[in-house]
Amino acid sequence: MTTASTTPNSDTSNLHEVAPDDPIRERIRQAAQNVREQTPLAQSFTNFVTINLVANAQLAAGGTAAMSFLPNDVTSLASSCGATYINVGTLLPFYRDALQEISEHLSRHGCKWVLDPVAAGVGVARTEILKGFKDYPPTVIRANASEALVLHDMWQLGDAAGTDEHNGPAGVEAADSVDAAITAATDLAAYLALHSPTHTGAVAVSGEVDLVTDGRLVYRLPGGSAMMTKITGAGCSLGGVTATYLAVADALVASLAASMLYNVSSGAAERASHGPGSFQTAFLDALWNVTPEEIASAPLYLA
């Protein structure tokens, strides 16, 4: 699946470090604290391959998980959840109509939700589903660079829609750099905010140096571990944890907090592990043990 940050020592020489006393860091710390204290429920309509890691990561981060593949379950539980997570990594024929119904229900009832457009551009059914989400867009999009670029083209956003040079769909892995997706991510986030009841939206793009934007500000987040590319579901579980944070915070803060949590935790897990198997176990332990203060003090820059 899509993956979280991969390189701990990426170049940040052209970026502006966010100061320790910047208000955004306190908002991130408070969001992390609220998750630990409130154990918010975030439901997931996610793929078969990574569902176990998604649920365990949500629990380890401090939230409560509910997983379902029945559209009626998702719509019935939506009002009781702080947020919903939809991942299109594995599809069945009936999902084409079901996911449109779910997104319309969430939109009409003002429910916050996170979209992971896994493998955007691959297959007719997935393309139709993702195009349909434009009418009832999510609160947050969490993607890799290639997925963000493809979705930007699908939704025909911005002055350069359909003209950006990129490598196109590449299955579940990114074929483009995060830097190549800055304009696409910013346009997507602005579109989400425009159609949100609270006028807030965010896009998080995972890569060598993660990117999070609300359509105005662009944050970059170095850190993490290359071992995240060696376990299945790193990016998918980040989407689920982003939904957990979205249950207690706005789109920008939730996206930043979840990505910073993953960067801190994956770095700690790499130091404590000896390979992919022990890394995944150590990663879940790190999600559980990291403090709100450690999350809020993780490397954070403004582009």
Swiss-Prot record:
Binding site for ATP: R142, S206
Annotated GO biological process: thiamine biosynthetic process; thiamine diphosphate biosynthetic process
InterPro entries xrefs: Hyethyz_kinase (IPR000417), Ribokinase-like (IPR029056)
Residues bound to substrate: M67, G233
Names of the cofactor(s): Mg(2+)
Pathway: Cofactor biosynthesis; thiamine diphosphate biosynthesis; 4-methyl-5-(2-phosphoethyl)-thiazole from 5-(2-hydroxyethyl)-4-methylthiazole: step 1/1
Domain of life: Bacteria
Stated role: Catalyzes the phosphorylation of the hydroxyl group of 4-methyl-5-beta-hydroxyethylthiazole (THZ).
Protein name per UniProt: Hydroxyethylthiazole kinase
Lineage: Bacteria, Bacillati, Actinomycetota, Actinomycetes, Bifidobacteriales
Gene name, Swiss-Prot/TrEMBL: thiM
